[in-house]
């Protein structure tokens, strides 16, 4: 019986340790550095983007081959969720917001146009903690 209790206790500990991982909190500075190392030009977000201007973790625009993306970092995942919500609330009616707005961890990405798989892979590969 003792062995069974020990085995069940060990299984419970392993199961608890293997739970769902928490969302990542990405770094503005490390993400910028990675994108620049990949040859991506960076710029400040447009002055008209008041959502990006309120991002507590920073924001910038990445100018890719045929597209660009404004990346806004929340100070936390909850803060990024708020940024995402505001973008969805204020978007123009003729914009398919679900097609151009993506959130991963604390990073909110607003694309100018539907992103290509190549651009998505580059950006996601450069999101750094």
List where the protein language model places each region.
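Short secondary-structure junctions
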Residues: 36-51, 91, 128-129
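Bacterial signal peptide processing site
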Residues: 19-21
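A short, solvent-exposed beta-edge/loop patch
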Residues: 91-129
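Positively charged n-region of N-terminal signal peptides that target proteins for export
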Residues: 1-4
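C-terminal motif of bacterial Sec signal peptides marking the signal peptidase cleavage site
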Residues: 14-17
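An anionic, turn-rich surface loop/hairpin at beta-sheet edges
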Residues: 50-53, 81-99
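A short acidic-to-branched-hydrophobic micro-motif
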Residues: 62-81, 107
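Secretory pathway targeting signatures of secreted, lumenal, and periplasmic proteins
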Residues: 46-68
């Amino acid at each position: 019986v003792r062995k069974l209790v020990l085995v069940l206790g060990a299984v419970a500990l392993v199961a608890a340790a293997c739970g769902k991982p928490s969302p990542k909190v990405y770094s503005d500075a490390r993400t910028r550095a990675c994108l620049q190392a990949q040859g991506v030009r960076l710029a400040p977000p447009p002055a008209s983007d008041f959502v990006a201007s309120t991002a507590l973790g920073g924001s910038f625009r990445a100018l890719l081959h045929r597209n660009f993306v404004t990346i806004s970092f929340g100070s936390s995942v909850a803060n990024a969720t708020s940024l995402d919500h505001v973008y969805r609330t204020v978007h123009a009616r003729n914009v398919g917001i679900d097609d151009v707005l993506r959130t991963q961890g604390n990073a909110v990405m607003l694309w100018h146009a539907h992103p290509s798989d190549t651009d998505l892979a580059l950006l996601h590969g450069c999101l750094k903690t």
